[in-house]
């Protein structure tokens, strides 16, 4: 990983360099997809040029350049619950911000958090709708209701939505939260 893109307040992308010395100490790269259900392998559709539209679900609009499939591969899948089950909670008692933008797999990933969603996540940013983009329909209202019923309150709604966990209302303002588009 060379860099991550962070959407700043002035609406420009800022490149954050990742220190290679931190890999395997503070940063672990796990080459797997996330979803719900049991661990398995699944099909992954890699789009041409990687414009951010690759997905576990086949694109509907492959006539558009950003949805042209370059390759179809099999990838391993786990849930965030599986990951959080071995997370060092004794060192990090909560996750300040969880950002999910997984091209129509977002609801699957959030459901795959299990109780960790309501117990350990302070801020949540998700892409709640990819309507007419993939051969998989995420119901935005059902997705939103699931998050709210998990103890979250809305910060902003739209295609990308932000929420905060009411369980952490006493510390939410001490966290340097930024909406990550």
PLM ranges: what are they?
Residues 1-181:
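Phosphate/nucleotide-binding beta-alpha loop and adjacent structural elements of enzyme active sites
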